[in-house]
């Protein structure tokens, strides 16, 4: 065999070997890309829980159950119904509502839920045991609504939804305009048990209360004259957050014994009066601020556009209200009351009580005036 033929054979074998290696690498890359796509799920969304060296999966429509916890007080039941309806109508996800109430309200609530457009929702009615609060809450007539037992349901999420790894909590004075799936997929940093909307965010406005200045930082909620508070070395100017809407990593919540920590500060407040004397917001906020100081993630501010109930006037433009993912009527002017801002927006989601026990106050007043 001539030297020329040997060179040709060697060259052909080299080309074949190169093509085989290239083909193998292409198959490996294709497999890797396929795995990456399946692990990523919905673009831009983050995992439920952080687990070191493990794949992380955001929830997609109709995949994993999304637990939504909301309280149902007899005198505010219309708010709960409107909030649930707004969530239900704006998502195709597998939502399970955990509605926290008392046995005395359960039948009324059930009859409302089983009528009309809410027949198809999935829900569980959970009775709240007030014994949980014994020795932890100091009765103060000036606090009004914030002293009601169901206000503290948010502290006991692992008890209310024991099998869930993650959950959303929301107050009864909200309307959801976005897909709750997006809120549920809020990314929580490693070691964080909850994500809140901070009061200094761009979608919030600073509220003036009782001459105490702007209640958007820690000094507006805690009494920094008390030694126990000072010993915590928390900056008084730290931005506070709103606990009316939040996402909780319940695995991390349990690991850190968050409920026990909250109860500890509730008891200490009863004994020592640690909360600010000018406190205008919910008394659930101070213990949460202490426990989650610099240890919480944040939700998109458009998922808690608040202060709609701070006054009867309109503080936001119609365009901004329409763009909001969640509207929050925190404050004294509730959308089912005599006067409220953007009541027409809230009323789109309200379903009249089939039993007639609950009625909108302003509508009742209008009827009385006509008569």
Swiss-Prot record:
It comes from the Eukaryota. Belongs to the glycosyltransferase 8 family. The chain crosses the membrane at residues 8-28. It comes from Mus musculus (Mouse). It is a single-pass type II membrane protein. Pfam families: Glyco_transf_8 (PF01501). It is an enzyme of class 2 (transferase). It is found in: Membrane. GO terms for cellular component: membrane. The keyword Transferase applies. GO terms for molecular function: UDP-glycosyltransferase activity. This is Glycosyltransferase 8 domain-containing protein 1. Its EC number is 2.4.1.-. Keywords: Glycoprotein, Glycosyltransferase, Membrane, Signal-anchor, Transferase, Transmembrane, Transmembrane helix. The keyword Transport does not apply. Residues 29-371 are lumenal. Residues 1-7 are cytoplasmic. Glycans are attached at residue 257.
